[in-house]
């Protein structure tokens, strides 16, 4: 296309200015002439220029990609054939250098062309960064980039896989250890809000732990013995969290408040009444207890007197109702554990004959469900618990087994797991908050390994996870639904709390971040003394002595102590005469141990009065002068005559 010059005009302007008009106006000409432009021609020229520059840019990019491919192939060939000739290498280097120069020129031209590019830019999806094969040793074409929607879909799939795997929900990344004592922690209780933990053990102590008020020292803020010298078997907070049910080895359960003060104590029944329904309370040792999940102030206990009794806090003088477990023959059987269902309408108890019996709460006569061989007879079933949906019951038997039951078909267990040793009559089992896992602990002999916390999947009942707790038995376990933390009581006096900072809420996370408080040292102010060893004695100030030493010194001074003079022992001294008989021994010698022998002749003493008796007889002679004036004496008899006169039965037998 030809461009019109500045001198080109169209129409009537080709003939130039009118000379007649110029003469009339009085000037020689009209000056410079205005330029005219062809817009269509200019637009066409611009379009062609843009197309040419875009073509050059695309050619430069294609050349650059081709060079990169050749470099990659050459690198692969060098790796395969390292012993290539030097001439080929030089040739390749020369070619590469020439290509590099050409590529640099093309890059410069492309940069300049990009700067001079006219028209709207290409969309970002069509303009991609050149692939750098030098950075990554990738063979073949690269996969296409993912869209944002595809990435979000993949992330959602990964999250769903994690949610489907219940093991990922176990909070066991961190743990803290609470030192209860040296004996077995046989009871654990956590309030519904998860603020306070209470532990009880074989050492009769009940300790309170406050997560919000506790620091990194992990010390209990209160310790007490509510049942004196009875082992604590069960501790449980009420559904409102204001009361704690304490079940010990005695026959009377207690209810205490959050601070440990007694609220009520159940009455003890009459031991001499045969029918246990007629007694007002338990008459034998308790095993466990449980609060009603819906009704405030109602709880349940089971005992060795073969009864399960329900109580009300407002009426401690008599139980509310009595359930009496029986065998198939109608005989008494001792319940070892009991619990309420989640809605509170059912009461389940496991007995020593291996049976599990479930009653309707309002019907105390006959059980609604009865399975007589749930566990081995003669073993103590330590725990029965309902799932959160209320359809499944888990039982932890003394026969080293864990079984799962469906109460809608209570004729056989759904699943059973064996090889779980237990040596304590209160070994726990519980459900996870999402009802997908079942947890229980195992017992061991001392020095024979470590106690474990075992996790089973509810759907398949496979052992999916284990946690090594400590070198002692695992007795109690508790999985709090709000905190998502696991509490464990062990046989060596420890209570452990397992949590995950990302999955758990509050609880142990509150006290871990607090530093341990430093112990305050008592400071005393004493009088300051300036000691100058070279000062004169008269100006020296005597040092302060202890009170005890000063009293001893004053005691030795008779003037200060006003000590009376002691008696003189032995010979006199200091102007004082020793007293004779001052001691007990000298007094005895003086008064008792004297020689009082009489050397006088008794005959002479009597004959001294003989003449006076003859002259004036009064005592003997006048008495017989009238009655017997002549003196008569008894005749002497021989022993033989006396022997003859004796009776036969008195005679001596020779």
UniProtKB/Swiss-Prot annotation:
Query: Which GO MF terms does the UniProt record name?
Result: enzyme binding
Low complexity bias (residue ranges):
99-111
Acetylation in keyword set = yes
InterPro entries, per this entry?
A: WD40/YVTN_repeat-like_dom_sf, WD40_repeat_dom_sf, WD40_rpt, WD_repeat_GAD-1
Residues of the region (Disordered) are 1-26, 43-175, 540-579, 630-654
Location of cross-link Glycyl lysine isopeptide (Lys-Gly) (interchain with G-Cter in SUMO2)? 296, 590, 596
Alphabetical keyword list = Acetylation, Isopeptide bond, Phosphoprotein, Repeat, Ubl conjugation, WD repeat
Q: Which residues carry this modification: Phosphoserine?
A: 621, 638
Q: Where, per the database record, does this protein carry Phosphothreonine? A: 579
UniProt xrefs under Gene3D superfamilies = YVTN repeat-like/Quinoprotein amine dehydrogenase
Compositionally biased spans, kind Acidic residues = 147-164
| Ranges of the WD repeats in the UniProt entry | 180-219, 227-268, 281-321, 330-369, 376-415, 421-466, 469-508
Task: Cite the record's Basic and acidic residues compositional bias ranges.
Answer: 45-78, 165-175, 540-565, 644-654
- Can you tell me which residues the record assigns to a coiled coil? none
Query: Does Thylakoid count among this protein's keywords?
Result: no
Please give the GO cellular component terms listed in this UniProt entry: nucleoplasm; nucleus; site of double-strand break
* Pfam families hit by this protein: WD40
Where does the record place the modification N6-acetyllysine? Answer: 452
- At the top level, the lineage of the source is Eukaryota
Family per similarity comment: Belongs to the WD repeat GAD-1 family.
What this protein is called in its record is: WD repeat-containing protein 70
Question: Which species does this protein come from?
Answer: Homo sapiens
